[in-house]
Amino acid sequence: MASMRTSSMSLLLLLSLVALVKAGVIIPQSPGCPPTEDKNFPQHVRVNLNIVNRSTNSRRPTDYHKRSTSPWTLHRNEDPERYPSVIWEAKCSHSGCINAEGKVDHHMNSVTIQQEILVLRRESQHCPHSFRLEKMLVAVGCTCVTPIVRHLA
């Protein structure tokens, strides 16, 4: 989870930097610069992918996936054509939820919690340093919900 959190934070910082540069907030634009709304404004920027602050000072329990009433396991999703190349995704351990006695209760449903993230996708194999932004839906955990019951009339 810490690796996934670090990757998510680095992408968030990267996207914030791109947005600030495009808006001209970080680098003041001289009067001769084209406005960002101009169709001739460049759609490409150079970004250094080295993360400045990889360590975080927050110490949180990392066993939520085991203690939850809807436990999950983490599976490695690896794609060398994507940055970050490794993203950890959750998979619910049961279709039902764990009750107070520690047994699976099939009157409740375990469902994944999904988060949309932005990743960098390699443009082509011929240009290894060229990436484009891509949305990706990632399962980050599971939760317990009441089932949807449909009554036939």
Curated annotation (Swiss-Prot):
Family: Belongs to the IL-17 family.
SUPFAM superfamilies assigned: Cystine-knot cytokines
Protein name: Interleukin-17A
Segments for region (Disordered): 56-76
Compartment list: Secreted
Pfam name, any one: IL17
GO cellular component, as recorded: external side of plasma membrane; extracellular space
Quaternary context: Homodimer. Forms complexes with IL17RA and IL17RC receptors with 2:1 binding stoichiometry: two receptor chains for one interleukin molecule. IL17A homodimer preferentially drives the formation of IL17RA-IL17RC heterodimeric receptor complex. IL17A homodimer adopts an asymmetrical ternary structure with one IL17RA molecule, allowing for high affinity interactions of one IL17A monomer with one IL17RA molecule (via D1 and D2 domains), while disfavoring binding of a second IL17RA molecule on the other IL17A monomer. Heterodimer with IL17F.
Molecular function GO labels: cytokine activity; protein heterodimerization activity; protein homodimerization activity
Disulfide bonds: C92-C142, C97-C144
Alphabetized UniProt keyword annotations: Adaptive immunity, Cytokine, Disulfide bond, Glycoprotein, Immunity, Inflammatory response, Innate immunity, Secreted, Signal
Stretches of the chain forming a coiled coil according to its record: none
Function: Effector cytokine of innate and adaptive immune system involved in antimicrobial host defense and maintenance of tissue integrity. Signals via IL17RA-IL17RC heterodimeric receptor complex, triggering homotypic interaction of IL17RA and IL17RC chains with TRAF3IP2 adapter. This leads to downstream TRAF6-mediated activation of NF-kappa-B and MAPkinase pathways ultimately resulting in transcriptional activation of cytokines, chemokines, antimicrobial peptides and matrix metalloproteinases, with potential strong immune inflammation.
Glycosylation site list: N53
Signal peptide: 1-23
